[in-house]
Amino acid sequence: MKLHKEFQFVYKKGKNQHSSNVVLFFLPQNGIRKVGFTATKKIGNAVKRNRAKRRLRALFCQYSDTLIDGTYIFVAKQSIVESSFEHIHLDFKKILTKANTFKDKLL
C-alpha cells in the first residue's frame, strides 16, 4: 500500500488493536491482501524508523500464510526502538490474535 487515501480508509473503517510496541489497523476483505507499515517521526531519525518497519515486515512474513485476507496496517510505536526483537514478536502475535486475523484459531 502506498496511497494516502488507502491508509485513511482503513484507519476510518477498520478495527484496531494496540500493544506496547505496535498498533494494528485491520479491514477484512475477501480475496485481497494488502499490507502497510508506518513509523512516525516520533520514533526518531530515518534509520530508526526504517529499522522498525523492517522488523515489522519480517514478523509479517512469518505469519502471512496463516492470516486471513484483508488490509493490514502496522504502526510502530516509539517504544519499539528500545524493545528486543523477542518482545516485539510477542506483541505482534498478541495483536494478531486479539484482532482474530488467524485462519486457524488454534494459533
Task: Enumerate the language-model features and the residues they cover.
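Positively charged, solvent-exposed patches that mediate nucleic-acid binding
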Residues: M1-L107
